[in-house]
């Protein structure tokens, strides 16, 4: 007599926030490389350890996202609203790139069409 067993396997994506946080961490610690005369990648700064296969590396530096750049399509951060109390990416210190920021208070009055 033959017996059957059913086995089901599936892959599931990790939490999106965790993936984003990991990528941001790798981006922030990416290794600067240059191409040697022999056509091989080498570290720009030999004081750092060689990157592992899991590390990010780059040859060209990232553009300055604080400034408007027509070539990359970046609008920059000038004129954007920021959160004064946040230490995250939406916080004024990071988003305004050290340029300082204007503060204002806004009061919005809206009719809510409430019925009692």
Curated annotation (Swiss-Prot):
Superkingdom as given in the UniProt entry: Eukaryota
Organism this protein belongs to: Plestiodon skiltonianus
Function: Ligand for members of the frizzled family of seven transmembrane receptors. Probable developmental protein. May be a signaling molecule which affects the development of discrete regions of tissues. Is likely to signal over only few cell diameters.
Signal peptide (UniProt feature, chain positions): none
Family membership: Belongs to the Wnt family.
Record localization: Secreted, Extracellular space, Extracellular matrix
GO molecular function: cytokine activity; frizzled binding
Biological-process GO terms, alphabetical: canonical Wnt signaling pathway; cell fate commitment; muscle cell differentiation; neuron differentiation; positive regulation of convergent extension involved in gastrulation; positive regulation of non-canonical Wnt signaling pathway
The entry's keywords: Developmental protein, Disulfide bond, Extracellular matrix, Glycoprotein, Lipoprotein, Secreted, Wnt signaling pathway
Record-linked Pfam families: wnt
Disulfide cross-links: 82-97
Name of the protein in its database record: Protein Wnt-5b
Post-translational modification note: Palmitoleoylation is required for efficient binding to frizzled receptors. Depalmitoleoylation leads to Wnt signaling pathway inhibition.
Family matches, as SMART domains: WNT1
Glycan-carrying positions: 69, 83
Chain residues carrying a lipid of type O-palmitoleoyl serine: 1
GO cellular component, one term: extracellular space
InterPro entries in alphabetical order: Wnt, Wnt_C
């Amino acid at each position: 007599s033959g017996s059957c067993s059913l086995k089901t396997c599936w892959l599931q994506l990790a939490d999106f926030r965790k993936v984003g946080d990991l990528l941001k961490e790798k981006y922030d610690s990416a290794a600067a490389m240059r191409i040697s005369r022999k056509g091989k990648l080498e570290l720009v700064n030999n004081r750092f350890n060689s990157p592992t296969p899991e590390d990010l590396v780059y040859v060209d530096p990232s553009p300055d996202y604080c400034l408007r750049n027509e070539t990359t399509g970046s609008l920059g951060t000038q004129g954007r609203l920021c959160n004064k109390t946040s230490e995250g990416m939406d916080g004024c210190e990071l988003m305004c790139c050290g340029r300082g920021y204007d503060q204002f208070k806004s009061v919005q009055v809206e009719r809510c069409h409430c019925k009692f």
